[in-house]
């Protein structure tokens, strides 16, 4: 609003990516994350393509009212990954891609998390994600380059949500737990 300049979504994503890489926060500019924040739904993004052409798949979001998303923030990274760290985990990332192609983003989230935790050699992250499944989560995985854990639980299973929150706050008191949901189409309507 300050300049009254209207930007297209791909221009906003490009600006965000430039800020991420210039500050050293991200290896790739987090283009996929920026696209994910632009609108509800899940997207498959080619971070090597020009930003305006990089969204390969764009599908509707899972119903926001049906799912609770828990973010377990573990503090700053202890290891700064490189792109080479991820190369050895292509099988897990291919499984994530196949799950997206089958329109199953929760399975994709889990496979992506497995690939990431292996690439980072994050034993604690793997244990924490597995603990989520032991406590009845539907999906869980470490974030793109760590160290946060993303956990998805059916929202009608309130006791499960509370049990998982209690589990992490008891065993990992230094972690911050955020309860949220997927973006809904109503939010997209409000933004327009």
Q: Predicted segments — roles?
A:
Residues 11-133, 155-159, 163-192:
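ATP-dependent small-molecule kinase catalytic core of the GHMP/sugar-kinase superfamily
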């Amino acid at each position: 609003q300050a300049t009254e300049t209207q930007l297209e979504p791909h221009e906003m994503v490009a600006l965000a990516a430039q800020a991420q890489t210039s500050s050293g926060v991200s290896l790739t500019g987090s283009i996929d994350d920026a696209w994910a924040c632009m609108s509800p739904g899940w997207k498959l993004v080619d971070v090597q393509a020009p930003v305006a052409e990089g969204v390969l798949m764009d599908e509707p979001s899972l119903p926001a009212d049906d799912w609770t998303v828990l973010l377990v923030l573990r503090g700053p990274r202890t290891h700064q990954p490189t792109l080479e760290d991820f190369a050895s985990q292509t099988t897990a990332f291919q499984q994530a891609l196949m799950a997206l192609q089958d329109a199953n983003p929760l399975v994709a989230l889990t496979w992506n998390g497995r690939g990431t935790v292996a690439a980072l050699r994050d034993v604690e992250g793997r244990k924490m994600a597995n603990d989520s499944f032991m406590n009845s989560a539907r999906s869980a995985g470490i974030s793109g380059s760590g160290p946060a854990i993303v956990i998805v639980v059916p929202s009608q299973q309130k006791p499960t949500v509370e049990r998982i929150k209690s589990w992490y706050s008891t065993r990992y008191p230094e972690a911050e737990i955020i309860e949220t949901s997927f973006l809904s189409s109503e939010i997209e309507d409000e933004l327009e």
